[in-house]
Amino acid sequence: MEDKKYSCEYIERNKAVSGCFAMFMLFVGITFIPSFLKDGAELMAKGLLFPIIVTLEFIFIFPLYYIFFRKREGLGLGSFRFKTFFILFLLILLIQYLLPYISGVNETESWSESQMALGGYIFWINAILLIFIAPVYEEIIFRGCLFNITYFWFGNNVFGTAVIVSMMFSVVHLQYTEIRTFIVLFLVSLTLSAARVKSRGLLMPVLLHILMNAVVTGIQYAAYMLPAS
């Protein structure tokens, strides 16, 4: 009787993980759309490729999450503790700025520079999408779906799960090219994974991600504009 109960629980959990895997593959498929576009490089140069991809990912992923996944274990809002949030955000800032300073590498990625150089409304559209939209579906996919998948496959090993998820998170950011950026992304992802584990949900990692992108974008924009003033 106990074996039958265990098998039923295992089957149900396996079904849930299969749904999460489908969500992750949807994200990957949309992310790699530029590889199949003949004018992908031209769209990127004009600053149009990023908003197209982000918009597509959001309009497909968020509704599916809201309808099918938001009530599943670890995929809801979770709890929120300001002290934990503040500590983790300080850690993210240290990773973003102290680590490059210590390593002696302070150059801005070419993609980030190209975003700052975009004129008029294109820059602001990209900035709004980067700050408020991308973090929502990225956390749904990585700290939500992919975390659940890996946690199941790795026998409930939280640390191993966080490492694998963070490796995947850094790798899919195809707009970057330098190894130190991928290291920073990996460490930031570990911090966001800690937020997910501590809060047992996605609200805290989403808000951390939004605030991080806002600070980084604001500082880069200020650094770009100051020499011109």
How does the language model describe each region?
Residues R13-F68:
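Alpha-helical transmembrane segments in multi-pass membrane proteins
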